[in-house]
Amino acid sequence: REAAERSKMIDRNLREDGEKASKEVKLLLLGAGESGKSTIVKQMKIIHEDGYSEEECRQYKVVVYSNTIQSIIAIIRAMGRLRIDFGDVARADDARQLFVLASSAEEGVMSPELAGVIQRLWEDSGVQACFSRSREYQLNDSASYYLSDIERIAQGSYIPTQQDVLRTRVKTTGIVETHFTFKDLYFKMFDVGGQRSERKKWIHCFEGVTAIIFCVALSDYDLLLAEDEEMNRMHESMKLFDSICNNKWFIDTSIILFLNKKDLFEEKISRSPLTICYPEYSGSNTYEEAAAYIQCQFEDLNRRKDTKEIYTHFTCATDTKNVQFVFDAVTDVIIKSNLMECGLY
């Protein structure tokens, strides 16, 4: 009788484990460097957990300041390389001052002098001209977000808002894991560093992943790649997508494509033609047509079109409402494919 009881218990445990496994969703976030993966992770914390506490926000102050200072420095350095002059010659003194103050600044402190220097530089017409040519050098996406708001963030009492935190940029190294529950599912999301050297470390770790969310920065189409400057970033991203989408490890994994930074793309497409990236493109440089073309370029890489569907969404990872809406749709796809596997659909 004890044996029978024990065997019943084992059965029950196995069944519970099975149910738990069917409710556990492993999501892998992939994509080239700076495509928005970590921003999506931050949004999950804001949408599905309680967001960032005041204490956590305070800790981001250091990053906000360093992102802001690094951005203005990058623009000033590029002015030299691109031979752009200041609109007002007095700004040259401010630029020298910037380097001195930035190198001696205490972490997480923005002195009124430094804030004043940054504000005067940012408002200079030469600096703005250089900023508008940022595709020719490396500049943080959030540069104008912080620099235009320097007065607010330089105040002594400043505490970063959720949006300020979303905009911070810190290179992801290693694997960042986040857990949350949504629609009765237990999500485990893995954010993997996008820079190339990181890739070989993780590709085999993720058998049994429910879905891959692959992020692409639409606005990268006119940029050069940071790591080796040889290949356009969009082509680099397509190459990575090709290797993931057609990878033997991921034959049964749902692939969800986030064509991200749609806001920056929409802003750029009117002044930087898509032919920079796709010389054969003959459509118009409107957001709809150009975005649809990029979507086809990625979806056409799928070599198993008859058996594998790619679920594409246009996203703006810094926009909480948009991410919430898209993630809701993604979850429905996951629930549906889970039910199909269990034969319940």
From Swiss-Prot:
It is a lipid-anchor. Gene3D superfamilies: GI Alpha 1, domain 2-like, P-loop containing nucleotide triphosphate hydrolases. GO terms for biological process: adenylate cyclase-inhibiting G protein-coupled receptor signaling pathway; adenylate cyclase-modulating G protein-coupled receptor signaling pathway; cell division; G protein-coupled dopamine receptor signaling pathway; GTP metabolic process. Heterotrimeric guanine nucleotide-binding proteins (G proteins) function as transducers downstream of G protein-coupled receptors (GPCRs) in numerous signaling cascades. The alpha chain contains the guanine nucleotide binding site and alternates between an active, GTP-bound state and an inactive, GDP-bound state. Signaling by an activated GPCR promotes GDP release and GTP binding. The alpha subunit has a low GTPase activity that converts bound GTP to GDP, thereby terminating the signal. Both GDP release and GTP hydrolysis are modulated by numerous regulatory proteins. It comes from Xenopus laevis. Residues 256-263 are annotated as: G4 motif. One of its GO terms (molecular function) is G-protein beta/gamma-subunit complex binding. Belongs to the G-alpha family. G(i/o/t/z) subfamily. Residues 26-39 are annotated as: G1 motif. It is found in: Cytoplasm; Cell membrane; Cytoplasm, Cytoskeleton, Microtubule organizing center, Centrosome; Membrane. Its main location: cytoplasm. Residues 315-320 are annotated as: G5 motif. SMART domains: G_alpha. It comes from the Eukaryota. Mg(2+) binds at S38, T172. GTP binds at residues 33-39, 141-142, 166-172, 192, 194, 260-261, 263-264, 316-318. Residues 187-196 are annotated as: G3 motif. Heterotrimeric G proteins are composed of 3 units; alpha, beta and gamma. The alpha subunit contains the guanine nucleotide binding site. GTP binding causes dissociation of the heterotrimer, liberating the individual subunits so that they can interact with downstream effector proteins. Residues 23-345 form the G-alpha domain. Residues 164-172 are annotated as: G2 motif. SUPFAM superfamilies: P-loop containing nucleoside triphosphate hydrolases, Transducin (alpha subunit), insertion domain. This is Guanine nucleotide-binding protein G(i) subunit alpha-3. Pfam families: G-alpha (PF00503). One of its GO terms (cellular component) is centrosome. InterPro entries: Gprotein_alpha_I, Gprotein_alpha_su, GproteinA_insert, P-loop_NTPase. Keywords: Cell cycle, Cell division, Cell membrane, Cytoplasm, Cytoskeleton, GTP-binding, Lipoprotein, Magnesium, Membrane, Metal-binding, Nucleotide-binding, Transducer.
